[in-house]
Curated annotation (Swiss-Prot):
The gene is thiE. This is Thiamine-phosphate synthase. Binds 1 Mg(2+) ion per subunit. It comes from Janthinobacterium sp. (strain Marseille) (Minibacterium massiliensis). NCBIfam families: thiE. Its cofactor is Mg(2+). GO terms for cellular component: cytoplasm.
Amino acid sequence: MKSNLHGLYLVTPDWDDTRKLLEITELALKGGVSLLQYRHKTADAALRQEQAECLQALCRSYEVPFIINDHIDLCLGINADGIHVGGTDKSVAEVRAIIGPDKILGSSCYGDLALAHAAEAAGASYVAFGGFYPSKVKKYPVTTAPTIVSDWKAQGKVPSCVIGGMTRDNSAPLVANGADMVAAISSVYLAGDPQAAARAFVSLFAK
């Protein structure tokens, strides 16, 4: 299993159609996704379980780490590779204590460097900054300054991820400033060619 926290970090949309979700996800995985996060804020427990198990099996076949958003019980229950938590979830320290030292743990830090430093100290594997641009999926204010990426590159030790309305073009300067990962949802899942869309993001990290 690859565990390189670098490149395209694909996040799932709130789709109840599991077959469609798997089909589009596999196309994206073929395009070079580095990590996949399962995030479905409106699904019931049964649908979350079903989709998570199917997506995890798909990720295993492509040797891509599989991350669960928020639901620690689900993460542990299926032995996912990691979990991502935000400001309304348990603290990073609490989650790290629950999941142990080996799983990937991501933390949403919005536009707050102090929060990122605290998350790093508490055991986060990576920190996520954003939103940078208006998002079709996640409704949050666009308040994060692009300079936070270079500031974190100079100060932080764990990788950073940028989120919020990401396209291949608007994320390019953030990657140039030091972002280790770009999180995308609609730019890949709603693309006419999801595999090509994923590949376009991946090209930002080619050196």
